[in-house]
Amino acid sequence: MSTTRTLTRWAGLLAASAILFGACSTPAGTTAPSAGSAAPPPGSAAPSADGSAAPSGAAGPSEELIAAAKAEGGLTTIALPRDWCNYGEVIDSFTAKYGIPINGLNPGGSSGDEIEAIKANQSNPGPQAPDVVDIGFSFGEDNKDLFEPYKVATWDTIPESAKSADGAWYGDYYGVMAFTTNTAVAANPPKDWADLLKPEYKGQIALDGDPRTSNQAIQAVYAAALANGGSLDNAQPGLDFFKKVVDAGNFVPVDANPGTIVQGATPVALRWSYNGLSHRDSTADNPTIDVVVPTSGRFGGVYVQAISKFAPHPNAAKLWMEHLYSDEGQLMWLKGYCNPIRYDDMVSRGIVPADLAAKLPDSTGAVFPTPAQLKTATDLITKGWDATVGVDVVVPPE
């Protein structure tokens, strides 16, 4: 199904996911956010035409925090491509507002790379030590001991199901898995998972990331399982499906990125909807990029933010979090097609511009795994890729 953009259909997705979560019993404080947490609550205000704000009821960062952050002289982030969730604007606005330069490490890195960077630099306060991470949902609770708890001013407006009770990590945004296609190479973009096995896509199908370490790639395999006889409790059919894609000669063992998609090296890439849509906009039809949420196996994925327990700039890290979870920061993510975790609060106060809300893709029926399901699937996929699929996914040369 193509990315027809209607808020009503998105709300339908959220309601369906809310039902799913209601049926899944998991420990309090660790459940994945029900997509219903991002939909306008019944009877609340619709997105505003102009985005005029109503008070959030939350104070901004204190003058003491701002001064302490500025005194540290910088902030180190990791794995934040400027075109991912509109991070370019988020980064630039932070520096412009507070005068704090940002050292961005490994923009093409995976969630696994982010965790390894924290571990490798526990006693190193230098420029290679990240202050903050933006990682896949399953990486949050699993690595909680590496994070410094901190609750932002808008903490109470973040759904309980989307955060660690002590503030060690909390959801930031989410999207759905989609097919991003360079139509200059693949003139007939695939619409569903079964299409990826067709001979016309020989040497064209790629993952955005290594499924042994990348959250995005791991969850692409998980999504494939849902469309091929698996379930949220059984991701093995996803691995089996990719083995079929390889055997058909359709799989390209290259870590897809906007450059490889445009060049035609990875013309059909499995990526989050927000990555595909922002890439589509950036090419201005040269070439034309098509973004499709598949008909079956519709799968939603949440990311989380956390501060490293070993952050060289702990106050700058806290100020960064305040920036991200402010109304301003959340709307910047929305501009990049990412559904911010505080969406329902902002909609209820009438500050979400209608044009931004209307850009979210039609993803009716998408499901979100619980933390337990996601952990089990992640373990299976990361450990089973080599045995079942047997292909290395390599990063293309610069």
Language model regions located:
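Bacterial N-terminal signal peptides that target proteins for export
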Residues: 2-14
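Bacterial lipoprotein signal-peptidase II cleavage site
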Residues: 24-38
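Extracytoplasmic "Venus flytrap"
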Residues: 47, 51-62, 70-89
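Conserved C-terminal helix/tail region of periplasmic/extracytoplasmic solute-binding proteins
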Residues: 50-51, 259, 362-398
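Extracytoplasmic ligand-binding site segments that recognize negatively charged/polar headgroups
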Residues: 76-92, 103-119, 126-265, 279
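Periplasmic-binding protein-like
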Residues: 174-178, 239-244, 250, 284-309
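Mature extracytoplasmic/periplasmic domains
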Residues: 298-299, 303, 308-368
